[in-house]
UniProtKB/Swiss-Prot annotation:
HAMAP family according to UniProt: CowN
Entry protein name: N(2)-fixation sustaining protein CowN
Organism listed in the record: Rhodopseudomonas palustris (strain BisB5)
Family that this chain belongs to: Belongs to the CowN family.
Superkingdom as given in the UniProt entry: Bacteria
Keywords: Nitrogen fixation
Biological process annotations from GO: nitrogen fixation
GN (gene name): cowN
Keyword match Secreted: no
Length: 92
């Protein structure tokens, strides 16, 4: 099999990339606030996973879904939590 494989072919017309970027943009607020050591770790792992393994934001979010969900609930960030859960239900 030659060429690249698009593992998101079933997500055609779902805007998964834009939706993932929106969630990451909202998570950036938590990363910048640095109120929990996890956020620095998450930012570092995101960079590593993207650069070294070629993973996109949807996959990075999926890798940390339970922790992200818990922290967003604890912080009362229900809007970002809803966006994350929508990604989970529709695209993960």
């Amino acid at each position: 099999m030659s060429g690249s494989f698009d593992r998101y072919v079933s997500f055609k017309n779902c805007d998964w990339k834009v939706r993932s970027e929106r969630v990451m943009a909202r998570l950036q607020r938590h990363i910048d606030a640095a109120e929990n050591p996890f956020w620095a770790y998450f930012a570092q792992k995101r960079t590593e996973l993207r650069e070294k393994q070629g993973l996109d934001d949807l996959r990075v979010l999926h890798n940390y879904l339970p922790t992200l969900r818990e922290l967003l609930e604890d912080n009362g960030d229900l809007e970002t939590l809803a966006m994350l859960e929508e990604l989970e239900v529709n695209l993960m």
